[in-house]
């Protein structure tokens, strides 16, 4: 292990590579109930070349790589299966460029959803994918994150225009471009988004963004059965009503919401809805 750590520190720098027990413990788990497994070493890259250099060392020593954002996953995705390198992208947290006229933004993987939207707000823009947790853009792209807004805006795969990816041999590739449509080459964005770190590490992500709606209206509807609630959503979509968010909550979950938040919602299947629009419609 000392040889691996020494090679990593030589390829990056001493402060970027740690085997501190507390840090290893923090990178041994996420928000899931899966058993924690400590990585062999934790690396903090500052830029794409750091990741490339680290990948080359990992390949030399035949060690697996485990990209780590904020550890908000509920599926155990960041937990090592065996000794390897946990790559913490928290230091790569810059918003590289906002092209407000093209409705595009390029970010490093450690940028969080809240951080991004706070900056986009200055331009009258927002990023719509909302998985609930304040995850990083790298983690959201790696897991093809979705949320209650997917009914209108789609999932993470629908937002990604380009990825800068470091492959296992340390080579750096671009998977797309800024173009809205291209028939040139394979659809590599679709391959890498949702790959959960198995094909490479993302070091920059170009995303579509949207204008902030003039009006946002929320609503709640209660139904006698889950089947009735689902049928209502189908009818709404078939009618072409531009719903922006929808979430179905069953009786058991409503009961827990009432207990935790001291609310008095009827304990019935419930739809929580949101609509985006403006004065003109």
Residue ranges of model-derived segments:
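Short, conserved charged micro-motifs
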Residues: 50-53, 115, 228-231, 279-281
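Terminal amphipathic helices with adjacent charged low-complexity linkers/tails
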Residues: 249-281
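Soluble FAD-dependent oxygen oxidases
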Residues: 37-65, 104, 147, 171, ...
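Short beta-strand-to-loop capping motifs
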Residues: 46, 221-225, 273-277
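FAD-binding subdomain of flavoenzyme oxidoreductases
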Residues: 94-247
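Short, acidic (Asp/Glu-rich) active-site segment that either coordinates a divalent metal cofactor
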Residues: 74-78, 85-89, 198-206, 279-281
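N-terminal flexible segment immediately upstream of the FAD-binding catalytic core
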Residues: 1-56, 72-103, 251-261
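Short amphipathic alpha-helices in soluble, non-transmembrane regions
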Residues: 8, 58, 232-236
């Amino acid at each position: 292990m000392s040889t691996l750590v020494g090679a990593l520190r030589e390829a990056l720098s001493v402060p970027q590579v740690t085997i501190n027990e507390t840090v290893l413990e923090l990178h041994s788990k996420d928000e899931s109930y899966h058993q924690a497994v400590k990585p062999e070493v934790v690396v903090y890259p500052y830029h794409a070349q750091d990741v490339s250099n680290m990948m080359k060392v990992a390949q030399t020593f035949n060690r697996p790589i485990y990209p780590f954002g904020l550890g908000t996953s509920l599926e155990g995705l960041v937990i090592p299966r065996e000794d390897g390198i946990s790559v913490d992208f928290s230091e790569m947290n810059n918003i590289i460029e906002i092209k407000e006229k093209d409705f595009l933004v390029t970010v490093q993987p450690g940028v969080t959803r809240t951080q991004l939207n706070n900056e986009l707000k200055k331009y009258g823009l927002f990023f719509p994918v909302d998985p609930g947790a304040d995850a990083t853009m790298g983690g959201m792209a790696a897991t093809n994150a979705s949320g209650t807004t997917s009914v209108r805006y789609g999932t993470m795969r629908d937002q990604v225009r380009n990825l800068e990816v470091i492959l296992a041999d340390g080579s750096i590739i671009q998977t797309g471009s800024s173009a809205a449509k291209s028939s040139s080459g394979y659809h590599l964005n679709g391959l890498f988004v949702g790959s959960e770190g198995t094909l490479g590490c993302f070091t920059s992500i170009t995303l579509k963004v949207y204008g902030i709606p003039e009006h946002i209206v929320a609503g709640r509807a209660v139904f006698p059965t889950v089947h009735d609630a689902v049928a209502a959503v189908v009818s709404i979509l078939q009618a072409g009503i531009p719903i922006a968010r929808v979430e179905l909550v069953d009786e058991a979950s409503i009961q827990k919401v009432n207990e935790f938040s001291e609310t008095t919602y009827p304990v019935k299947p419930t739809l929580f809805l949101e609509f985006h629009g403006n004065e003109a419609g």
